[in-house]
Amino acid sequence: MGCSGSKNASNPKDGAASKGGKDGKTTADRKVAWERIRCAIPRDKDAESKSRRIELFKQFDTNGTGKLGFREVLDGCYSILKLDEFTTHLPDIVQRAFDKAKDLGNKVKGVGEEDLVEFLEFRLMLCYIYDIFELTVIFDTMDKDGSLLLELHEFKEALPKLKEWGVDITDATTVFNEIDTNGSGVVTFDEFSCWAVTKKLQVSGDPDDEENGANEGDGANAGDGVPAAEGSA
């Protein structure tokens, strides 16, 4: 489920989503899983969500270092959040989220060598995963015929929904052609999701903005990013 490559345009629009789905999960599978997962990911900025994030970070941090490697994050997404109920492409999604959070954290802290995620970046990583999952649900509603591919008319019909999500489009045809990177005349989920996440970040800023980053830092020990006790957050 990477950011490049389209499904071969010769693949017929045959309603495959109702049978096996874009990644082995059906639309019904994802809908059921999403209702649980959207509540399980503590991405909001309120005190309760932050407290849940602290506990979740500790559960992910099996080595007790205050820093998460990719394997710890992936294992936690499987065993604790059980995100594989939604998709069979979880490693790819988590890798993207991990890299995004890590890179932003290194930029904020003025370092660029660590291949780790600390508590400061943890919320951003969760937000990115949430966004990809939410985009999958949106794509399911846009893909009216269940072909796993979007045509221009389906994209145009979904403009109000995309605006609600945070992406306002004025020239649908031009944007559709930009998303369709291989010129096949249809858009795959990979093309759509990579475009939508990037566009949302350009318009609204990273899901974990600078103000929130500072607040999250209050919940971590300076220097090592280990979550402090809940009362000190």
From Swiss-Prot:
Residues 20-29 have a biased composition (Basic and acidic residues). Residues 1-29, 203-233 are annotated as: Disordered. Residues 214-225 have a biased composition (Low complexity). Signal peptide: none annotated. Residues 48-83, 130-165, 167-202 form the EF-hand domain. Ca(2+) 1 binds at residues 61, 63, 65, 67, 72. Residues 1-11 have a biased composition (Polar residues). Belongs to the calflagin family. May contribute to the rapid motility of the trypanosomes, playing a role either in flagellar structure or in calcium metabolism. Could alternate between a GDP-bound inactive form to a calcium/GTP-bound active form. This is Flagellar calcium-binding protein TB-17. It comes from Trypanosoma brucei brucei. The gene is FCABP.
